[in-house]
UniProtKB/Swiss-Prot annotation:
GO molecular function: catalytic activity
Protein name, UniProt field: Branched-chain-amino-acid aminotransferase-like protein 1
Species of provenance: Arabidopsis thaliana
Taxonomic superkingdom: Eukaryota
GO biological process: carboxylic acid biosynthetic process
Length: 555
C-alpha cells in the first residue's frame, strides 16, 4: 500500500465542512478521514462532550501517532482527504502536520455559523476557532505555501464552479461525482455524527442557501463583533471564481495604480484603503452633513494649509458642529497620514470633517453625541486637467444654488447641485460645466472658479453665488502682483463666449486654460499670454511657500 497524497481541510464548525467531506468521499480516487485530531484535542483540553468517552475509546488520542499513522499513514487510494476543525490544531503536534500535504481553508460568515452552532452546543470564541484559522493561514504563508480559501456561501450558491476552482488550487482533477451523494450516513462519519450531522444525512448535495437568514440571537452579538474581523481577514483571500457571486462589473482600473495601497485617516486611526470606512450612522451617510477641504502637496510642503483650515473650521461653525477637534489635532492627522504613506509631492488631500456618528438614524443634529469624524484621504494625484493644451467647458442647465437656499461659502459635502451639472459635462465629454446663477449670470463651474480676460482686463464673477476658493483668492493676488487690471463683477455667459482668454482655478487642477465653451473657440484656441504668466507665477508660489511636513528631507 502506497502513501496517499494528503489534502487538509481546515474550518470552523458549522461551515459546511461535513458536506464538503461527503463531496470528496464520492471520488473514486479519494479516502476521507473525519476529524482525526478530535480525540487528541478532547484529551488535552478536557473539554466535555456528550460523546467524549466514546471518542476517547475508539480514536487514537496520541497526537504524534495520529499525524504519523492516521493522517500520513499508508492507504489504498491516491488521495486522503482529512477534515479538520481549526481549534483541534493544538500546540505540540508534529510540524509535519502543516509542512506536508496540501492545505485549504473553508470559511463561513459567523452571522450564519452562530445560529446553527447554538442549536447543538453553546458557542464561544474558542469553539468557533476563527483565531486559529487565521493562525493556520499565517503559518502556511510563512512556509511559502499560502492555502486556497473558499467561502461556504459560494459553495452553496455555485457548488460546481467553487469545487472546480478548489480542485485547480489543489492540482487535482475535478470529478462531477463530487456534486451529489446518497442521503444518510457514510462509514467514515465520526462517532459525533448523530449530534451534528442531521442536516447532512438528509441531504443529497450542497443545498441552496435559504432566501432569508435565521434570526440572529442577540445573546451572541458580542461574539459576532469579535469574530467578524477575523472572518473578513480570511474572506479577503477568497478567489471569487463564480459568476453568480462576483460583481457584474469588471474590476475598475485606478487612474493612479499606486493608490491601490494607500492608507487613510478615519476617526482617530490610519487604515488600509479597503478598511477605511465610516459608520452607517455617520452624518455624512445620513445626509451629506459634513464639511471638507482639498489640499495639495508640493515638494514636502502643504500649500495654503492655514487658509484651508480656516475655511474648514468656519464651515463647521456655520453648520453648528459640536465637539470639533482642535486645529493642532487636525494638522497632526494630516502630517501622520502623509508621512505614513510617504507622500511628499504630487499629492492631493481630501480633508473631511463630518458632524459624526448618530445614536439613531435621522437628520437631527441632536442625535450626534459621539463628536465629529475626521477623514484624511491622501492620494497620488497630479493636476486633473490638461493645463498645457487647455480644456473644454459646456454650460449646464442646472443653476447654482442661491444663498437664499444654501450658502456656497459653507464648504459642505452635499454636492448634488454640482454633481447634476457634472453629469451634463460628462455627457458631452467636456472637462466641466459652467453654472449660472438664478439671473443667468456666470457663477463658477461645477468644480472650480472661473476667470476671463477681455482687452487686457482680468474679470471673475463675484462670490455671492460661488465658493470663494483658496486658489481663486491666490490667483486674484497674483493678477494684481503681475500688474494686470482685476475686476470682480457679474459676468454674462456671452462675455465668456467672446473672451480673449479663460481659465479655471482650483486646488485639484491649479490654473487650467479653457480653449472652448459651448462650441465657441476662446481667443485663438490656444493658451493665452495672461494665463501662461499666471500659471508660471502660481507654480513659483507653490515652490516658495507652504507648511513643511515634519521628517521630510529634500532628495
Amino acid at each position: 500500500m502506497a502513501e496517499p497524497e494528503v489534502i487538509h481541510s481546515w474550518s470552523a464548525p458549522r461551515s459546511l465542512s461535513t458536506s464538503l467531506m461527503y463531496s470528496f468521499a464520492q471520488r473514486l480516487d479519494t479516502e476521507v478521514v473525519d476529524e482525526p485530531l478530535y480525540a487528541s484535542f478532547l484529551k488535552a483540553t478536557g473539554f466535555d462532550r456528550p460523546y467524549r468517552d466514546e471518542v476517547l475509546s475508539k480514536m487514537e488520542c496520541n497526537g504524534e501517532k495520529v499525524v504519523k499513522d492516521v493522517i500520513y499513514g499508508s492507504g489504498s487510494k491516491k488521495y486522503r482527504y482529512c477534515k479538520h476543525i481549526s481549534k483541534q490544531r493544538l500546540f505540540g503536534l508534529p510540524s509535519e502536520l502543516m509542512s506536508r500535504g496540501k492545505h485549504f481553508i473553508l470559511i463561513r460568515n459567523p452571522l450564519n455559523i452562530l445560529p446553527s452552532f447554538e442549536k447543538v452546543h453553546p458557542p464561544s470564541f474558542l469553539e468557533l476557532g476563527l483565531g486559529e484559522l487565521v493562525s493556520i493561514y499565517s503559518d502556511l504563508c510563512q512556509m511559502g505555501t499560502p492555502p486556497a480559501v473558499i467561502d461556504a456561501d459560494e459553495l452553496q450558491r455555485d457548488p460546481e464552479t467553487t469545487l472546480r476552482g478548489l480542485c485547480d488550487d489543489l492540482e487535482i482533477p475535478f470529478q462531477a461525482s463530487m456534486l451529489k451523494w446518497k442521503a444518510g450516513p457514510i462509514p467514515e462519519d465520526g462517532v459525533w455524527a448523530p449530534w451534528w450531522y442531521k442536516s447532512v444525512h438528509e441531504s443529497t448535495g450542497f443545498s441552496s442557501p435559504k432566501k432569508y437568514p435565521r434570526t440572529f440571537p442577540l445573546s451572541h452579538y458580542d461574539l459576532l463583533e469579535r469574530s467578524l474581523p477575523l472572518y473578513n481577514i480570511l474572506r479577503s483571500h477568497v478567489k471569487h471564481s463564480s459568476s453568480l457571486l462576483s460583481s457584474p462589473l469588471p474590476p475598475p482600473s485606478l487612474p493612479v495604480p499606486e493608490n491601490a495601497k494607500l492608507l487613510a485617516w478615519v476617526g482617530d486611526e490610519i487604515l488600509p484603503r479597503e478598511m477605511a470606512k465610516v459608520s452607517v450612522f455617520d452624518s455624512v451617510v445620513q445626509g451629506g452633513d459634513s464639511v471638507w477641504e482639498g489640499l495639495r502637496i508640493y515638494k514636502g510642503k502643504i500649500f495654503k494649509l492655514e487658509e484651508h483650515l480656516d475655511r474648514l473650521f468656519d464651515s463647521a461653525k456655520a453648520l453648528a458642529f459640536d465637539n470639533v477637534p482642535a486645529r493642532e489635532e487636525v494638522k497632526e492627522a494630516i502630517f501622520r497620514t502623509l508621512i505614513t504613506n510617504g507622500m511628499f509631492d504630487n499629492t492631493h488631500i481630501r480633508l473631511s470633517l463630518t458632524r459624526g456618528k448618530k445614536v439613531t438614524s435621522g437628520m437631527s443634529p441632536a442625535y450626534n453625541r459621539y463628536g465629529c469624524t475626521l477623514i484624511v484621504l491622501a492620494e497620488w494625484k497630479p493636476p486633473v486637467y490638461d493645463n498645457e493644451g487647455g480644456i473644454v467647458l459646456v454650460t449646464a442647465t442646472t443653476r447654482r444654488n442661491s444663498p437664499n437656499n444654501l450658502d456656497s461659502k459653507i464648504h459642505h459635502n452635499n454636492l448634488l447641485n454640482n454633481i447634476l451639472a457634472k453629469i451634463e459635462s460628462n455627457n458631452t465629454n467636456a472637462a466641466d460645466a459652467i453654472m449660472l446663477d438664478k439671473d443667468g449670470y456666470v457663477s463658477e463651474t461645477n468644480a472650480t472658479n472661473i476667470f476671463m480676460v477681455k482687452k487686457g482686463c482680468v474679470l471673475t464673477p463675484h462670490a455671492d453665488y460661488c465658493l470663494p476658493g483658496i486658489t481663486r483668492a491666490t490667483v486674484m493676488e497674483l493678477v494684481v502682483k503681475e500688474n494686470f487690471i482685476l475686476e470682480e463683477r457679474r459676468i454674462s455667459l456671452s462675455e465668456f463666449h467672446t473672451a480673449n482668454e479663460v481659465w479655471t482655478t482650483g486646488t485639484m487642477g491649479e490654473l487650467s486654460p479653457v480653449v472652448k465653451i459651448d462650441g465657441r473657440v476662446i481667443g485663438d484656441g490656444k493658451v493665452g499670454p495672461v494665463t501662461r504668466t499666471l500659471q508660471n507665477a502660481y507654480k513659483k508660489l507653490t515652490e516658495d511657500s507652504g507648511v513643511p511636513i515634519p521628517t521630510y528631507q529634500e532628495p
